[in-house]
A protein has these predicted regions:
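Mature extracytoplasmic/lumenal regions of exported proteins
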Residues: 66-161
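Residue-identity detector for threonine
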Residues: 2-4, 8, 35, 58, ...
């Protein structure tokens, strides 16, 4: 009697069968949605459109308001909108462009002066996570641009005198 895997009673599974099964699983995981390479291409395309850091106005502050790496020491990310104290509005938004595997996200950070509402700067970045073959390993990821994020934005807006 032969099983659906092509083995008969008492025989062991041929290593070639493992290759076929793994290949079928790989093909099945790619069917029905974009691959991680396609999502990476979309991440790169979006980055080219509006990704990166844009500074519209810098603010000079006393040197004692910065740590040894030149980062503002008054930044408190857990305070959300008030993360920069009473004079500035900090906003951070995460948008899910794709929630299925592989996921695609857009991070947008901005800093406004409270007194006049002027946008001082913003950072936009995109990322992909997952899209790999199932397994015990951590999913891969890709993001761009390389230089972006909240801390980098703040070090470009707030400058030590």
């Amino acid at each position: 009697m032969t099983s659906t895997l092509g083995i008969t009673g008492g025989q062991h599974l041929n290593p070639l069968h493992f290759l076929h099964i793994f290949s079928l699983l790989a093909l099945a995981s790619c069917a029905g949605g974009p691959t991680k390479l396609e999502v990476d291409d979309e991440v790169r395309r979006q980055c080219a459109v509006d990704g990166g850091i844009k500074v519209y106005e810098t603010v000079k502050l006393p040197a004692d308001m910065f740590n040894q790496w030149g980062q503002p020491n008054f930044y408190r990310p857990t305070q959300k909108e008030n993360a920069l104290g009473p004079g500035y509005i900090f906003a951070g938004n995460l948008d899910h462009y794709r929630k299925e595997n592989p996921v695609m996200i857009r991070w947008h950070f901005s800093v406004r002066r409270k007194s006049d509402g002027k946008l001082l700067g913003e950072s936009i970045s995109y990322g992909r996570g997952g899209g790999d073959l199932p397994g015990p390993w951590e999913p891969s990821s890709y993001s761009c641009p390389e230089i972006a994020g909240d801390i980098t934005l703040l070090t470009k807006i707030f400058i030590a005198q």
